[in-house]
A protein has these predicted regions:
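C-terminal catalytic histidine-bearing segment of alpha/beta-hydrolase fold enzymes
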Residues: 161-163, 169-224
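N-terminal cap/lid segment of alpha/beta-hydrolase-fold proteins
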Residues: 1-24
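Soluble non-cytosolic domains of exported or imported proteins
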Residues: 25-28, 44, 81-89, 126, ...
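Short, proline-enriched alpha-helix->beta-strand connector loops that line the catalytic pocket
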Residues: 155-160
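Short beta-to-alpha linker loops that shape the active-site pocket of alpha/beta-hydrolase fold enzymes
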Residues: 18, 37, 65-68, 141, ...
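Primarily recognizes the serine-hydrolase "nucleophile elbow" in alpha/beta-hydrolase
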Residues: 46, 99-100, 107-154
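Serine-hydrolase catalytic machinery in alpha/beta-hydrolase-like enzymes
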Residues: 9-11, 27-103
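The conserved beta1-alpha1 loop
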Residues: 32-36, 139, 164
Length: 224
């Protein structure tokens, strides 16, 4: 699509389950999925189990670029500060495009991300706290766009699933434990799974069982 602030063409990828009938009435739940630093817009589509599980549970999946590969979705300063603003804006633009194109259940829009995308999940949910029904983060690079307490206060009403490996060499496990402690202190509905021996990337990108944990969590919190 054309990104209006710059006139650039920005890609995104979308998966639609085979159960969706364009002429029907049933609305789809949606997984807005945010990639890690330096990855392409469709990188998450290759994560083991994601599309199979989305097909089985009837989810649409969309993977925005975030304007550039290193935009941090606004959660941290990009090399050009304007890129961070555009990175967040691209995600919200793509969400609206999908909602215009498909029948999306507004009560079952979930936001999740891996690494940089985890930080982006924290940031975007805090900026748009009434859009999403639940959150998920895997090995999340802590958002620094605002103090942790300020971000958690804004998302305290949202259920969140957190996946972290204790041998992560990019996002130290203690950093994620600190955020989880903040969630617990607020009485947030959260589920924290710490993987013994888990690394930064393969614990989610190449592990369908861990990917299933996210989908299962969203299935539960999205029940009507």
């Amino acid at each position: 699509y054309t990104f209006e602030p710059t006139g650039e063409s920005i890609p995104y990828a979308i998966f639609v389950p085979s159960s969706y009938d364009p002429k029907g009435t049933e609305a789809l739940p949606l997984l807005v999925s945010l990639h890690g630093l330096g990855r392409s817009y469709d990188w998450l589509m290759g994560y083991h189990g994601l599309l199979d599980q989305a097909e089985e549970s009837g989810y649409a999946v969309v993977t925005p670029l975030g304007y550039i590969r290193e935009g941090w979705f606004g959660s941290r300063p990009a090399e050009d500060p304007q890129d961070g603003v555009y990175s967040e804006q691209d995600v919200m633009n793509v969400l609206e495009l999908v909602r215009d194109e498909l029948r999306i259940d507004s009560d079952r829009i979930f936001l999740w991300g891996h690494s940089m995308g985890g930080g982006g999940t924290y940031h975007i949910a805090a900026k748009h706290p009434d859009v999403f029904a639940g959150l998920g983060v895997a090995a999340p690079a802590p958002a620094i766009s605002a103090p942790m307490d300020e971000i958690l206060d804004k998302i305290a009403h949202l259920p969140i699933f957190i996946l972290q490996g204790d041998q992560d060499d990019l996002v130290p496990v203690f950093a994620t434990r600190t955020w989880v402690a903040g969630m617990a202190a607020r009485g947030m509905q959260h589920l924290y799974v710490e993987i013994e021996g888990g690394d930064h990337s393969l614990l989610i990108s190449q592990d369908a069982a861990n990917m299933q944990k996210f989908v299962d969590f969203f299935n539960i919190v999205g029940q009507k």
